């Protein structure tokens, strides 16, 4: 984003008061509209824009705006939460990305205030992108910084009735072992309640978490898969197969010993599950 637009954002935020949320949100929108690409630039398909109420402003621009908002908001978290709510609720995909990014420093400054707020925002996600941006920008920072204090709080999120709350938690839990390998076994245990979830968005997050666990402690992941090797639940089998099919190639050799597990699943699988299992077996045999 240009220095001129950055200065515009700073000016808008410097004048912000909680009683003027609508004006501030509108002024921020006018700034990101200036960075909107030409219609011919295929950054996001028209159908997706309509579904997400998206204009098509590039994500790096939106994140730059959000970071500037966050610099001021971290010093006045309570005052800025109404603006975050309005951006999330009323300003489409662009507003949600700006809000999620701004919440990053706000959460680090006031986690007890921001974490419950983020949970409620997650409930109203429109897409997996909303949910994942919120998880990684607005929830993950404090969990990664102080897992001994904040990780356990996500257990209830994993069991929430709302699929986006579940996905946000599983995403954050799953990413922790990337930097803190000693938490891998615990993180896998925490996502276990979502393993057989019927919703594909949740299952994809669980598969992602298993793959990220492989970066922290592959042995813990092997133990986790073996633990569920007797499951006949198609949802569980799909997750375990997707984890192998989508695993980073350099980690796959550490899971070849699990080939008999997948071969047994293939022997008893229904027709719907066979394709997933065959894909996992193919990946493990390479």
PLM feature spans:
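Alpha-helical scaffold domains
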Residues: 1-286
């Amino acid at each position: 984003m240009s220095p001129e637009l950055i200065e515009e954002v700073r000016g808008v935020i410097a004048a912000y008061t909680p009683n003027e949320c609508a004006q501030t949100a509108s002024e921020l929108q006018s700034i990101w509209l200036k960075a909107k690409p030409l219609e011919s630039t295929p950054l996001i398909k028209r159908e997706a824009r309509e579904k997400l109420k998206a204009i098509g402003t590039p994500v790096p621009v939106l994140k730059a705006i959000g970071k500037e908002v966050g610099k001021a908001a971290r010093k006045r978290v309570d005052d800025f939460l109404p603006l975050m709510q309005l951006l999330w609720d009323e300003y489409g995909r662009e507003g949600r990305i700006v809000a999620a990014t701004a919440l990053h420093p706000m959460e680090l400054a006031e986690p007890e205030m921001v974490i419950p707020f983020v949970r409620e925002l997650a409930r109203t996600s429109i897409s997996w992108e909303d949910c994942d941006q919120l998880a990684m920008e607005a929830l993950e920072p404090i969990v990664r910084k102080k897992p001994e204090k904040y990780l356990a709080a996500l257990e209830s999120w994993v069991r929430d009735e709302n699929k986006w709350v579940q996905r946000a938690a599983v995403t954050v839990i799953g990413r922790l072992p990337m930097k803190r390998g000693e938490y891998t076994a615990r993180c896998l245990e925490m996502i276990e309640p979502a393993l057989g979830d019927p919703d594909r968005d949740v299952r994809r997050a669980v598969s992602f978490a298993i793959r990220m666990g492989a970066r922290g402690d592959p042995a813990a992941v092997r133990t986790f898969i073996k633990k569920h090797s007797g499951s006949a639940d198609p949802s569980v089998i799909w997750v375990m197969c997707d984890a192998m099919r989508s695993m980073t190639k350099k980690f796959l050799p550490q899971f070849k010993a699990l080939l008999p597990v997948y071969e047994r699943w293939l022997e008893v699988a229904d027709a719907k599950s066979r394709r997933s299992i065959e894909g996992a077996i193919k990946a493990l045999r390479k």
